[in-house]
Each structure stands twice: as structure tokens, then as C-alpha cells.
């Protein structure tokens, strides 16, 4: 696999070649994913739940993400690595740039921030400093207490229009990628069609430019609640490498996610 860059992802969108992404937190899984077709790894603050056992992602620190980013980068020099910026690490442009720099030094190719138009100045500042940005709209887990739980967003037209407006604002500020989480598939298509930057969906149907899953959901080892949008590929294939290959193949072909995994 040749080195994946922002230009690679833009070309994939233009050619309608679906982007495959998974979360990872260590070198072994990064290498496994690299060897079996994954193009993007997210070092997600989801580690607060799947690794640290928390009820949400709010306890994750910038140092946690930096540590796991270094581990992931050690497993692959070619994969495109996105590092999540944890809760309250991007409350001002200055804080955002300082904390993002730590993640870039740890080996990230891009940082991800949750939120809409209010992030404009911070994203602009990051872009001016040469730090690529991924936005995140829809169900943004760091706002779980505002939403009253992990709930589908954007079903009401007013909400949908706000998400579309936020997406356009993030792109205008300089964001080069956008994650759409737990929104109706029809809305995900509207957002994807409205942007020139690639979109990556999780619980957003199969009309986005790519897909991402939490690796624990991919192999069916999630504790407790199993999201509607997840699929246990290990159950279907019997071993980890084949599970990853099957995920990538199904994303590329459009077989995953299917109608049973999307929200209306």
C-alpha cells in the first residue's frame, strides 16, 4: 500500500472509490488493518469506553490520545491516522492549536473535532498552522449529556438544515474531511452532495464517501449495547484478517452498510 494522504482521499471521493476506516489504539491492530485493506485509522476517544471501561468519552485526556497515536503510528507508516481531540481540549483557538500540535507530534496526519459553526475560528487557526482537520457532525459523543443519551440526530427538518449549514461552515473554515454519525441516510446524502470534501459515515447509511466502525464492534466484542449500525464481521469469517478484508470489500462494493444498519 502506498502512503495515504489528504490528496488520496480527495481522489477517492472524485472517483467514487469508498474510503475504509476503523478505529485502532495500538501497533498490532494498526499493522493488521494496514495489511488487510484499511486506508484510514481513527485513534478515537471511544477508547474511553472500549479500553478504559467508561460510560462515555468525557474522561479521555489529550495525553491518552497522544500515547495511543504513537502506538498506532508505530504499526503503520502508510495509513492515514486521524487523532480525536478529547472533550474540552479545543475550547479556544489557542488551546486547540496547542493540543493539536501534541497529537501531530505523536504521529497523527489529521485531528478531529466535534461540533459545528462555532468551531470556525479554531479550524481556521489549525489550517493556518498546517494542521489538517476532520469535522464531526450528527451524534457527537462528547455532547451526550446535551442530547440526553446516544440518540439519532437530524430527523427533524430544522435539525437537518442546521447540520447541512454546519457542514458547509466547517468546509469553509478549512476542514478537509467530515465524519457523519447517527443521522438519517437521506440527510447524509444531502450533506455529502453539498460538500467537496469527503464524508465518512457511521450509522449514516451507505451514500457517504466512506465508512468507519469501532474495531470492537467489527469483531463483536463490545460490552453491553450493540449499535444498530454495527456488524460482527468476525462471526461471518472466523478470523481477524478475513473479518477486516470482508469489511473493506463490503464497504467498497456498497454491501455494507445495508438497509438494516441505517436510520430513516
Swiss-Prot record:
EC identifiers of the protein: 2.1.2.11
Name of the featured protein: 3-methyl-2-oxobutanoate hydroxymethyltransferase
Active site per the UniProt annotation: 181 (proton acceptor)
Pfam families per record: Pantoate_transf (PF02548)
Family: Belongs to the PanB family.
Highest taxon, organism lineage: Bacteria
Listed GO CC annotations: cytoplasm
Enzyme category, top tier: transferase
Binding site for Mg(2+): 45, 84, 114
Keyword list, A-Z: Cytoplasm, Magnesium, Metal-binding, Pantothenate biosynthesis, Transferase
Gene field: panB
Residues reported in the UniProt entry to bind 3-methyl-2-oxobutanoate: 45-46, 84, 112
Gene Ontology MF annotations: 3-methyl-2-oxobutanoate hydroxymethyltransferase activity; magnesium ion binding
PANTHER family for this protein: 3-METHYL-2-OXOBUTANOATE HYDROXYMETHYLTRANSFERASE
Assembly description: Homodecamer; pentamer of dimers.
Catalyzed chemical reaction(s): 3-methyl-2-oxobutanoate + (6R)-5,10-methylene-5,6,7,8-tetrahydrofolate + H2O = 2-dehydropantoate + (6S)-5,6,7,8-tetrahydrofolate
Cofactor (UniProt): Mg(2+)
Function per UniProt: Catalyzes the reversible reaction in which hydroxymethyl group from 5,10-methylenetetrahydrofolate is transferred onto alpha-ketoisovalerate to form ketopantoate.
Keyword Cytoplasm part of the UniProt annotation: yes
Localization per record: Cytoplasm
CC cofactor note: Binds 1 Mg(2+) ion per subunit.
Entries under CDD domains matching the protein: KPHMT-like
GO biological process, one term: pantothenate biosynthetic process
